[in-house]
Amino acid sequence: MKQHTLAEAIAHTGVGLHSGVSTHVRILPADAGSGRYFVRVDLPDSPTIPAQVAVVSQTVLSTQLGGGETGVRTVEHLLAALAGMGVDNARIEIDGPEIPLLDGSAQEWVTSIAEVGLVAQAVTNNLASFDIQEPIWIHQDDAFVAAIPASETRFSYGIDFDLPAIGNQWYSWSLTTEPDTSFAQEIAPARTFGLLHQIEYLQKSGLIKGGSLDNALICGPDGWVNPPLRFANEPVRHKILDLVGDLSLLGYFPRAHFLAYKASHNLHIQLAQRILALSN
């Protein structure tokens, strides 16, 4: 398979979910073999942070790459958009600590990528041929993530909440011969969601400073606070979006069936770390 990069640069500005800080992100074409990487253009010497499993620094309600003042937080939606649309190489310039949440989904990123299109590059992505040979299972209480041998790359997710509006949901999505179209229609529009009874606690914990009814679905005991939903099962589709973004830190998607149930960014990253160890 050939590698691909953007045909032209794209950009978005918005507020970060947890920091509440407004940042500007510009994504530029990058050389074949360079991968996806972030550049903190607001800092001296513009430090570079590769979008790789090895540099994950924390996974509390989002995934952060790099530590201290040079890190970049909440990278999962943007990385899912790039990976889901087939962008192997990209220079991601950001002037702050957190990727803008935008509308809470990956839809705006995907729309911009589709508008400029991709350019094929000479380097072949040999890593994309790596297959999972034996099942991998990681458990944490009743939650789990897994990767099992399969004839295609597929993502399946389950969630279970006491709130009737969410309840138990399952969804399965696979990379197809036209993954950009499938991802753009089935996964990218799904927005992040939160639970009404947790908001005050999270805010007191210094989180979700940039959260609002414009960038997150909120669910309470009486239903959704800010309907309508884009899909009846939008919450579980968003969990697949998160999983795709976190596993994209491998730099490729092995041929496997990825399964997750009531999982978290932490479990997603543990799975990616296990796969990376096996591939080496």
UniProtKB/Swiss-Prot annotation:
UniProt-annotated binding residues for Zn(2+): H77, H238, D242
GO cellular component annotations of the record: membrane
Keyword Cell inner membrane applies: no
Keyword ATP-binding: no
Catalysed transformations (reactions): a UDP-3-O-[(3R)-3-hydroxyacyl]-N-acetyl-alpha-D-glucosamine + H2O = a UDP-3-O-[(3R)-3-hydroxyacyl]-alpha-D-glucosamine + acetate
Transmembrane parts of this sequence: none
Active-site residues (renumbered): H265 (proton donor)
Protein name: UDP-3-O-acyl-N-acetylglucosamine deacetylase
